[in-house]
């Protein structure tokens, strides 16, 4: 049997053992808890002195400092260039994490290896030392087990009832001398032969400190037992939790303590309360402290240190891949820590709603409590809703949280006035101020699906909050009080109103205040870029007056965009030096991320698809543009007789065509205005992707006009120079609708012939929307749906008719796409584009 097979068998046995033990513990624990009166447990909790709780929590947080001695020993043995203060802070964070999700200490060992490898050359020796620390967690218990075996601690009651525990103690006790001998004979470092002994002593003291915390929990709930008997039960329970591989020993440890104290005659309600206090003081409080430390210890400085460390040499292949993510993970620790703290804060104060309700029921001034409860609940819900925003380092989310903290503080001060909780709120407020200064974005994009999700989540939380309060009051027999005039009346609707007011005010403030932050480059810079590097089919629209421009730092490339509904909608591909497009888009996306905007590209070509893909985008085919090859275009031949017939008809009617160069006279503009108004027929002009009838815009390029025999303008089209590939396009095409003549055909034919005479080789006839989209059953569902719209909704919009009309000119069809972020909705993105096009 080779080593690989042995390892697999061992892993299977370990998982089977842990699973079986977990099931056994869960069933037994459920059986024991089912007989407990939880109302009595709550009554016992209400009797606890608050100062005793404060001392307990301080002791629980301080007890974990002992574990930092492991890291002090480690840093001194390996002669690490790291300050004692940093060792203590980092160690505290590691140990708090390990206590919650320890899996027998393996999580802590992994984090230690990740952190300390940047401070030493000898990685192999580091791993050896960390392994020694991992094993010493058991040797401390082994030393304490020896004290039970030699009857220093009295465990006779539990050993008489559960005889197999005695053999476990013997085995664990025997492990200590083996470990000490082995660690001295084969030490990680020959100059530090007693490291194993030192770690064992640290482990022993730490377990005793944990035992003292639990014992103090028993004292404050009035569960008096002999310390010697208590410590014996604790050691056996700790062994059970450690070998179970369950994070924190949850379940296994608690079951043994519950059974052990039951044999000593302590009521189960008091034991349960004692365990809850112990879990909070020894696990939850250190985690809170660790999260606070993480907010300051890790982040940008840590990331820079790792990148600049002489010991940080990226490995190849998999190691390099993992290390590339490690730096980013460390940089996110502060915001993640604060987000977790805010989440726990909101949960704790949601529970405190019960205290306000309880006090209100026995107070005559219901109205005051009614308002304070609604404010308190609203603030708690706002805290909860902004947890993700705090993690994403959004200033708007942090401001929401800060206002919520202030509102909770006011409600707390005027109701149950817990100075412990007010102090905690002050700490969180300070952390939020620090986070606000570090925040790298003003706000996150507002998306419709997120709004709907937040509304549903809010309703769910408020419903759960109501069920919790009602259920607790019912369990405590408080519903015997008349409640139709109590604080719960109309509470839900007032809460919704307060939330709406706060959200509305802050959202308006950000949109109003930071709308001024949006920058726009000068149009002269864009003109210079186009003159130097060329344009595209849409570049002439820089003169339409409804766009803003964003250039790169060197002013060699730009894009044109417009803001709408928390989005920056970009028209077409970037323009300018193609080598600068990467830099341009990165700067633009950074700019949009800082302001909390989405980025949408409209009508882009397939030329730069890889570039857009690099920024996490996906694509939707909008349709195809008809590009006519003027070198092949002709009105001669049998197939083109329709073109000749159209031109001959206009000649017979003495309708002429000419190109008018700017500047234009007022009389000429008035003639065009008359035609345009009749053509629009009170319809609203479109914007953004097309030009509008505007004298300033029209004066930037020649205009083709058709005149009748009275020399009156009956149709016109505005030219769109492209400044690249000898191509040209037209924008506005308008005619007198009362004339029963093919004026659009006439304009196109005359423009095609004129463009060919002027030496142009390509003519853009515009896009056929949804043309050739989703034609294969392999296409995305959204594109197949768009294809069905193209085929079956021709009555609403002439999708097929537009393509058929342009097809008679035998164009080459080039695809055009919508580019949007992969986590955005297609339909919401399309909706924003349509709003930009249809509204100025």
Curated annotation (Swiss-Prot):
It comes from the Bacteria. Pfam families: LPG_synthase_C, LPG_synthase_TM. GO terms for biological process: lipid metabolic process; phospholipid homeostasis; response to antibiotic. InterPro entries: Acyl_CoA_acyltransferase, L-PG_synthase/AglD, LPG_synthase_C, PG_lysyltransferase. GO terms for molecular function: phosphatidylglycerol lysyltransferase activity. Signal peptide: none annotated. Keywords: Antibiotic resistance, Cell membrane, Lipid metabolism, Membrane, Transferase, Transmembrane, Transmembrane helix, Virulence. Its EC number is 2.3.2.3. Catalyzes the transfer of a lysyl group from L-lysyl-tRNA(Lys) to membrane-bound phosphatidylglycerol (PG), which produces lysylphosphatidylglycerol (LPG), a major component of the bacterial membrane with a positive net charge. LPG synthesis contributes to bacterial virulence as it is involved in the resistance mechanism against cationic antimicrobial peptides (CAMP) produces by the host's immune system (defensins, cathelicidins) and by the competing microorganisms (bacteriocins). This is Phosphatidylglycerol lysyltransferase. It comes from Staphylococcus aureus (strain N315).
